[in-house]
Amino acid sequence: MSMAREELAERVRALLPPRVHCLEKRMFGSIAFMRNGNMLVAPLKDGSMLARVGKEGMDDALARGASIMDMNGRSMSGFVLLSGDMVEDDDALSEWLQRCLLFVDTLPQK
């Protein structure tokens, strides 16, 4: 696993609130943090992060500088890509984790 991805994964683990239980699952050549069977975030090899904000959260996330998540030429609805700069400090990363948790906690458990 790349150093940037592992460092970001460690920060995600440290910043998730204690009450939040997430499982870690290998996906996208990375570690995806899963909440109740739904993907929350996934740190990527270049230090960027896949984040699940939901369709309703897309416009706000894009306005804040996120990009549409594209996998093999297809956009992933409800998911955005956060550049490494967007999650560089713990306050920013924590804010994005909270946004993702607010959405993912509305989804049915899988």
Question: What role is predicted for each listed range?
Answer:
Residues M1-K110:
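Charge-dense, helix-prone N-terminal extensions
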